[in-house]
Every structure is written in structure tokens, then in C-alpha cells.
A protein has these predicted regions:
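Juxtamembrane intracellular "pre-TM" segments in multi-pass secondary transporters
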Residues: 45, 50-68, 247-279, 465-466
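Intrinsic disorder in cytosolic terminal tails and internal cytosolic loops
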Residues: 1-60, 449-466
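Helix-loop boundary and gating motifs at the non-cytosolic
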Residues: 56-111, 266, 270-317
């Protein structure tokens, strides 16, 4: 093909018609060939990308079937576990009649996830992630079965229930990093946020169904049969995992657990924007956990709602979070995930601030506003999870996600404890307004930082080496 200079000279110099015709004939095929080559290269790039998983592995043509099998088993496990958890809560409510005891139970159910998830991430990167998930599911299910047998034998002390709640949370600390580290190896990058949102979707379904199912099963059959149902759900999840193949990552050289944890943190720290978003997410989850804990008090003390009204309002919030999860799964979240996270914080803030300013006669408006906040809360942590999976090498993803779940596991009980004290001090409606302003600051100012905006740049799509 002729270069740009000769084309310019040819255009300026007079030519005979025959020469012009001959010149055009020699240039046209080259131009067409160049365009065809560019189009072929672009099509080849798109095809190659579609054949690769988010972690850069060759993608199985049956990837959707594999993921569907895994998540079908997890769906059964999440719903049966949620029903069992509510049966335990109802049992403690009826037998102990103490808010302190319920708070302790919740603390034992959350803290191990926060404290042990970094270790769970090390295990997820060291061993086959499918095996880690199966052992974790079996361990959690077996602990419920043992507790059921002890209840049948007549042993049902509060201390024993807290012990088994702790054990279940320990197994969750190993299951969660392995699960989220496995997904990028199985799913195309453009569908990764959708798959990550499945967990939120199932949790939303569980939050709607589990209280009614768990309390109904407890009332009809007692605590032990409900715990056995959770064990059956764990077996279903393990059976589903047994039907699929999950690749094994390359194991690094032997090193201490502390050194391996540090490698996971360094994999996050190399992207300053990820660390900043993790900080914002942690603060936001602390605020939202506190709002969830005082939600019934706001309803009863400020609006004078009864138990039925509170139950309906809780169902509205759960349904709206389900709707938010479905929307993000259908949409896919777009390419600018850091912007999506910051925008969702703003969209969460507005209804929460409005809810704190309502008069005491506007309960149903309050329920609607909190439902609206729940829609956008479903968009809050999925983008960050996806950004971590996209940017951290697959052999370090488990450890990176371990820190992600550690922050979540610690943020929620810390938020409940600190938020309760602050709400007592400044008043519950004022606390709602303050929490909304906090979300507003996270959203509006977060995206002003260059390191956070850089996460949405095309050049950041590849995983940076350490």
C-alpha cells in the first residue's frame, strides 16, 4: 500500500485520465484489504475474548451449565440454612426472652467470618477450590446434624447453640473466598457481575422466605427436624459441586500462612483504588448494618407501628433488594463498575435521609423509602467484588477475597454495636439522616479520586502483576 506522502504528491500533481484511473485501481484493493483485515482482527479479538474466562483461562463451552449446577446446589443450601437460622433465632427468642442473648447469638454468627476469612483465602489459593467448598459445606451441615442430635437427646443450652453458630460461621469463612475465587475461572468477564449478584439474589430470596419457613417448621416440628433439613441442603450443595470440574490454580512455593496473607493484601494494595473502595464499602456496610438493627425501633418508637406492620415493611425491603439484584443481573452493570458503586451510594443516601425526616404519621412512606434504598443496596458490593476478581491474578484471588469478606464480617457487628450507641445518643431519626449523609459523602467524593476513576479505565482491565 502506498504511504501517506506519495498519496499527497499524487493528489497535487496533474494526471491524465488514464493515469488517474490506473492509480485508483491500484489503490482500491489495498484499502479494501486493509479494512477487511481490521474487521477480521476485531472480530477475532471479540471471539477470543468470548472464549476466555474472566481470569484468562480457556472457557468451557458448557460454562453456563456448570455455573447453573453449582448455583442450584448453593440455592438449596442458602435457603435451608436461612430457614434453620431463623428457627434458631425463634428458639432463643422464646426460651431466653432476652435482647442481649439474641445480640450475642448474632455476634457469634458473624465474628468468625470476619476474623478467619483471610485464612480461608489462603486455603482457597493453596488447595483445589472445589474441594474446599465441599468440605466447608459438609462441615457446616454436619455441625447442624450434631446439634440436632444433641437437641433430641435433651441438650439445648444457649451456650451450646452459640458454639454451633460459631462453628457454622467458621466454615463460611472458608467457603466464601473459595466460591468467589472460583467464579472468575468459570465465567466470561462480561457476565462476572451478573454471577456475583446471584449470591445477593439468593440471600434476598432467603430473607423473604426463610423467616416464615423457619418459624413455621420450628412451630410444627421443633428445632431438631429444621436443623436436619439444613444438613440435607448441605448434601445437595455438595452433590452439585461433585458434578462439575473446577480448575486447580498453580500452587506457589511453600511459605508461612502470615506471608501468604500478606501476598493477598499486596495483590489488593497494588491497586490503590481498590483499597479506597474497600474502605468506603466497609464504612457503608457498618452504617447499613446499624440501620438494619434499629429499623424495628424506628418503626415502633417513631412511627408507632405494630408487629404486623413491621413484618410487612421488612418483606418490602427484602422484595426490593430482590428486585435490585434482578435488575443488575439483567443489565450487567456496564463497564464503569467503580462509578456504579459510587452512584449506588448516592442512590442509597437519598431515601435514607428522607426517611429520617418523615413525620411520625408517614410509616408506609418510610417502608417505601427503605425499600428503595434496598434496591440500590443490592448494587453496592457486587461491583467491588467484580473489580477485585478482574484485577487480582487467579492464584491470589482467594486471599484477596478473604480480606474482602473479613471486612464485611467485621463491619456488620461493629456497625451494629457502634451504631446502637450513636443512635441512643443523637436519636434514631437523626441517626438515619446522619447515615444517609455518610453514604452521600462516599458516593459523591469517592469518584473524585483519580485512583478510583482509574479502575474504570480500559487500561486497567488487565491484572497488574505484583
Amino acid at each position: 500500500m502506498t504511504d501517506g506522502t506519495s498519496q499527497y504528491i499524487d493528489a497535487k500533481m496533474p494526471t491524465m485520465p488514464e493515469e488517474a484511473s490506473m492509480h485508483a485501481d491500484t489503490n482500491r484493493p489495498d484499502a479494501i484489504a486493509c479494512l477487511e483485515t481490521d474487521e477480521d482482527a476485531s472480530a477475532h479479538a471479540r471471539t477470543s475474548q468470548e472464549r476466555m474466562s474472566a481470569s484468562g483461562r480457556s472457557l468451557s463451552p458448557r460454562w453456563l451449565r456448570i455455573v447453573s449446577i453449582i448455583w442450584s446446589g448453593q440455592a438449596v443450601s442458602i435457603i435451608t440454612s436461612g430457614a434453620s437460622g431463623w428457627a434458631i433465632i425463634w428458639h432463643v427468642t422464646q426460651t431466653e426472652q432476652s435482647a442481649l442473648m439474641l445480640s450475642l447469638l448474632m455476634m457469634f454468627s458473624m465474628l468468625p467470618l470476619g476474623l478467619l476469612s483471610p485464612l480461608g483465602g489462603v486455603v482457597a489459593d493453596r488447595f483445589n477450590r472445589k474441594a474446599v467448598m465441599i468440605v466447608a459445606d459438609l462441615g457446616a451441615g454436619a455441625s447442624s446434624l450434631v446439634l440436632a442430635l444433641l437437641v433430641v437427646a435433651g441438650t439445648r443450652s444457649f451456650a451450646l447453640i452459640c458454639l454451633f453458630a460459631t462453628i457454622r460461621s467458621v466454615f463460611s469463612a472458608f467457603h466464601a473466598p473459595a466460591m468467589t475465587a472460583a467464579m472468575p475461572m468459570l465465567v466470561p468477564e462480561r457476565h462476572l457481575l451478573r454471577i456475583n449478584t446471584l449470591d445477593q439474589l439468593l440471600e434476598s430470596i432467603s430473607s423473604i422466605c426463610a423467616p416464615a419457613v423457619g418459624i413455621a417448621l420450628y412451630t410444627a416440628f421443633g428445632l431438631a427436624p429444621t436443623l436436619i433439613i439444613e444438613f440435607i441442603g448441605a448434601l445437595v450443595a455438595c452433590a452439585a459441586l461433585g458434578l462439575v470440574k473446577i480448575p486447580t490454580v498453580k500452587v506457589e512455593e511453600e511459605s508461612t500462612v502470615a506471608e501468604q496473607m500478606r501476598v493477598g493484601w499486596d495483590a489488593l494494595r497494588v491497586h490503590k483504588g481498590l483499597v479506597m473502595l474497600l474502605g468506603g464499602l466497609t464504612v457503608g456496610l457498618m452504617a447499613f448494618a446499624a440501620l438494619g438493627a434499629i429499623y424495628p425501633l424506628m418503626a415502633t418508637q417513631h412511627f408507632g407501628a405494630d408487629g404486623t406492620m413491621v413484618s410487612v415493611a421488612e418483606a418490602i425491603s427484602g422484595t426490593c433488594m430482590l428486585v435490585g439484584s434482578i435488575v443488575i443481573m439483567a443489565w450487567g452493570g456496564g463497564r464503569r463498575l467503580a462509578l456504579l458503586l459510587c452512584a449506588s451510594a448516592v442512590l442509597i443516601a437519598v431515601p435514607i435521609i428522607a426517611a429520617g425526616l418523615l413525620p411520625s404519621t408517614a410509616f408506609w412512606i418510610y417502608a417505601g423509602l427503605m425499600g428503595l434504598a434496598s434496591v440500590f443496596m443490592a448494587w453496592f458490593n457486587g461491583p467491588l467484588m467484580t473489580l477485585i476478581q478482574q484485577r487480582v491474578p487467579e492464584e491470589k484471588t482467594g486471599r484477596a477475597m478473604g480480606f474482602f469478606y473479613a471486612l464485611i464480617g467485621l463491619a456488620m457487628p461493629a456497625g451494629i454495636a457502634v451504631g446502637g450507641v450513636i443512635a441512643e445518643w443523637i436519636g434514631i431519626p437523626t441517626f438515619f439522616v446522619a447515615s444517609g449523609i455518610l453514604f452521600l459523602v462516599i458516593g459523591l467524593f469517592g469518584y473524585l479520586f483519580k485512583d478510583i476513576r482509574a479502575l474504570d479505565a480500559p487500561s486497567q482491565a488487565s491484572k497488574a502483576p505484583l
